[in-house]
C-alpha cells in the first residue's frame, strides 16, 4: 500500500470519527461513506470486464450456464429491504418481489438483462429466491432433451424447477412445498440426484438435507432425509449445528462433503454417496451414521459455510516423498454475519483440510485478509469470508480459488500448494447510488455506513469471475491479470 493511500485512509477515518461524534451528540442516526461514489474500484491482478446493476436487488448465488452458443447467468436474490421491499423491474415497469435475475453474459463486457422471476414475499433472508442450480435436460437421465432446467429456492418454503430453454421466457415445471427453510443445494446433472437444503417440518433444526431423484424434473422422487444424529424427529438432548450446504463429487468420486454451521460450531462431514442414497432410509441415529466416513469438528468460533473438495493434489514440498506425496484436500470457507467486527463473532476465514485419511481429517493451513491493510473493520458492513467459487472446470480448479470477503471484495488465492495458500489478486468493487447502508449501534444510536458487500462468487469455463453484491450494487464480471492469469494458464490479455 502506498504512502498516499495510507494518508487517504487516515483522513477518511478522521472524518468518519468526527461525523459519528456529531451524530451521537445530536442524538440521531448517521450514514457515513467509507467508499465514495465515483471512486474507482480497488484491484490487484484482477480487472472489471462488465457490470449489471441487477435492478438494485440484493444478490446471493450466481450460476453460470453454457446454454447452446450462449452463456447465461442465473442469479438468486435475497428478499427486499424495509425501505424497498419491491424494487422496480424496468423491463415491466412493475414493483416486484426479488427472486431470480436471468442475464445473458455471452459478451461479458456487455451483459444483457433478460428476465426477472419474482420470489417469495419477505424482506432480507425471509423472502426472495436465493439459490440457483442449472442442468440441461439432455444430460439428465430422464429429462426432456429440449429443456434446460433451473432449480431454485422459493424463499424458505419451497424448491422450484423451471424450464429455461428460452431464458427470457421461463416456464414453471413443479414446486416442492411445505418446508420451513431452504438454502444452498447441490444438483448432479449426470444423475439427477439432488441434495436439497431444506427444513422438513418435524426436524429439530431449520436446515437439514432432503435427497431427491430429479432425473425427471417433472416427476421428483424423494429418496430420504438426512442430518446429524440429534436433529431428527423424536430425538432429545442438545441439538447439533444445523446444515449450511454440501458439494457432491458424483458417482465417480462417491463422496458428499457437508458443511454444518455458518460462523460458529462448524462441522465438516465426509459421506459415502452410494450408502447415503441406497442405504437404510429411516432417520434414526444408526442410519444417519451409516454413510458417514469421517467428521471434523471445528472450533466453536468458526463455521463451515462452503466445503469445496479439491481432490487429490500433488504437494510441491512432498514431491520426493515415497509415500503420501499427494493429499486429498478440502477447502472450508466460514461466513461472517456481524457488521464492523463487533462482539459475538470471531474472525471468519478460509481453512485447508487434509482429508487423505478420511476418518481423521485435519486442518493444515488457513488464509485471511489482513484487516490492517485497509482498516476493513471500520469501512462498514461485514468484513470476513463468505463463499468460494464451486466450479470444477479445469481453467481454475486446483490452481486458483476465489473467495468473497464482503467489504474486502473478492480475493484470488493461489492454491497450488494448499499447505501454503497465498493471495495473488483482489477486486473491491466501487459503490454506486444503489449500494445500501449497513448499521451498528453506538451508545444506543444507529451509525450506518455505505460499503460494498461482495457476497457470492462463481467462475465459468472461459475464465471469467462473477461476483454479486449483498448491498444491492449488482453483478461484476472480472478477469484475472498478470501473475494470477499466468497461474491459470490463460493467454495474456
Residue ranges and their predicted role:
Residues 17-29:
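Bacterial N-terminal signal peptides
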Amino acid at each position: 500500500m502506498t504512502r498516499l493511500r495510507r494518508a487517504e485512509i487516515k483522513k477518511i477515518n478522521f472524518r468518519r470519527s468526527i461525523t459519528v461524534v456529531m451524530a451521537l451528540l445530536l442524538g440521531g442516526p448517521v450514514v457515513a461513506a467509507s467508499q465514495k461514489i465515483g471512486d474507482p474500484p480497488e484491484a490487484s491482478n484482477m480487472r472489471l470486464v462488465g457490470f449489471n446493476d441487477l435492478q438494485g436487488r440484493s444478490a446471493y448465488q450466481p450460476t453460470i450456464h453454457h446454454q447452446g452458443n450462449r452463456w447465461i447467468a442465473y442469479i438468486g436474490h435475497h428478499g427486499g429491504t424495509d425501505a424497498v421491499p419491491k424494487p422496480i423491474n424496468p423491463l415491466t415497469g412493475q414493483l416486484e418481489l426479488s427472486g431470480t435475475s436471468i442475464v445473458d453474459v455471452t459478451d461479458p463486457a456487455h451483459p444483457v438483462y433478460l428476465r426477472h422471476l419474482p420470489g417469495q414475499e419477505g424482506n432480507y433472508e425471509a423472502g426472495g429466491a436465493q439459490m440457483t442450480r442449472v442442468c440441461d435436460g439432455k444430460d439428465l437421465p430422464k429429462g426432456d432433451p429440449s429443456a434446460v432446467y433451473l432449480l431454485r429456492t422459493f424463499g424458505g418454503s419451497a424448491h422450484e424447477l423451471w424450464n429455461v430453454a428460452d431464458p427470457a421466457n421461463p416456464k414453471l415445471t413443479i414446486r416442492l412445498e411445505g418446508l420451513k427453510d431452504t438454502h444452498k443445494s447441490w444438483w448432479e446433472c449426470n444423475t439427477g440426484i439432488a441434495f436439497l437444503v431444506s427444513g422438513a417440518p418435524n426436524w429439530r433444526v431449520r436446515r437439514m438435507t432432503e435427497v431427491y431423484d430429479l432425473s425427471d424434473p417433472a416427476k421428483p422422487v424423494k429418496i430420504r432425509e438426512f442430518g446429524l444424529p440429534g436433529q431428527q424427529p423424536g430425538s432429545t438432548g442438545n441439538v447439533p449445528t444445523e446444515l449450511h450446504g454440501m458439494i457432491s463429487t458424483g458417482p465417480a468420486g462417491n463422496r458428499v462433503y457437508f458443511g454444518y454451521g455458518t460462523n460458529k460450531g462448524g462441522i465438516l462431514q465426509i459421506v459415502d454417496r452410494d450408502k447415503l442414497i441406497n442405504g437404510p432410509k429411516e432417520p434414526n441415529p444408526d442410519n444417519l451414521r451409516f454413510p458417514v466416513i469421517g467428521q471434523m469438528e471445528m472450533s466453536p468460533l468458526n463455521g463451515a459455510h462452503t466445503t469445496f473438495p479439491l481432490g487429490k493434489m500433488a504437494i510441491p514440498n512432498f514431491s520426493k516423498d515415497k509415500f503420501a506425496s499427494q493429499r486429498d484436500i478440502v477447502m472450508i470457507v466460514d461466513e461472517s454475519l456481524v457488521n464492523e467486527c463487533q462482539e459475538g463473532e470471531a474472525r471468519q476465514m478460509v481453512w485447508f483440510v487434509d482429508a487423505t485419511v478420511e476418518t481423521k481429517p485435519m486442518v493444515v493451513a488457513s488464509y485471511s485478509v489482513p484487516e490492517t491493510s485497509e482498516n476493513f473493520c471500520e469501512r462498514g458492513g461485514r468484513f470476513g469470508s463468505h463463499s468460494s467459487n464451486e466450479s470444477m472446470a479445469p481453467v481454475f480448479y486446483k490452481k486458483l480459488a476465489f473467495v468473497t470477503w464482503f467489504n474486502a471484495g473478492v480475493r484470488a488465492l493461489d492454491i497450488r500448494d494448499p499447505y501454503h495458500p497465498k493471495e495473488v489478486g483482489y477486486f473491491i468493487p466501487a459503490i454506486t447510488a444503489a449500494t445500501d447502508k449497513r448499521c451498528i449501534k453506538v451508545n444506543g444510536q444507529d451509525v450506518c455506513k455505505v460499503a460494498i458487500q461482495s457476497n457470492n462468487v462463481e467462475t465459468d469455463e472461459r475464465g471469467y469471475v462473477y461476483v454479486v453484491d449483498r448491498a444491492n450494487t449488482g453483478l461484476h464480471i472480472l478477469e484475472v491479470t498478470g501473475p494470477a492469469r499466468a497461474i491459470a494458464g490463460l493467454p495474456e490479455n
